Amino acid sequence: MTAIAALTGFRNTPLSIVTVGGADRRAPAWERMFGWPAEGAAAVPLEVRSTHDRNIWAARLDRAVREADARVLLVADGLGCAASAWWARLSPADDVGRIAGALLFAPPAEAEDSALFASPKARLPFPSLVIQPGGSPEDVRTAVQGWGSRLVAADRPRDRAAGIVAWRQAQRLFLRLTEQMVEHDVDRGRAITGWR
């Protein structure tokens, strides 16, 4: 029940949006699908070609999260999903604790991220949704399970919004789906324990 209270506690509080685009420099999936802006309040571009670049990128993400004026909704695309998962597992708990949740769009196949973003196989320390536009959900199932994320296969056209309204739409989507996940997990827990 604590999780539900925590979720409803920030329902009317805007989240700071921190975006991590993919390394391929194309429009991020959230922009193509929903018309959300390419960047949130803070954007941490993924320009990583070596472990040195990766560590600099992680320090920039740490700073963006620390400087956010509210809890953070992390929105990542492509290789940015694997990079964000790597960051979440290995960065300071104070920084990661500021993340309310993550929307992870079109993560790459596991083999693509294994070199620079290999990380412990542990659930992410915040709720996360993987949105797989088109393509097969099977392509990302391993990542989804390893991250403890919920998968949303999205292959139908969506209404497109713009500007600040678009980020409010992203927050509502995240909250609605997260509340459904929590309610489902609570119901499942009650069924297992026989509590009604």
Language-model regions, residue ranges each:
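Gly/Ala-rich beta-loop-alpha elbow adjacent to hydrolase catalytic centers
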Residues: 74-89
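Conserved alpha/beta-hydrolase fold motif
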Residues: 69, 73-76, 102
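The feature captures the conserved acid-bearing segment of alpha/beta-hydrolase catalytic domains
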Residues: 106-165
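Structural beta-sheet core signal
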Residues: 19, 74, 104, 129-132
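A conserved short beta-strand
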Residues: 94-109
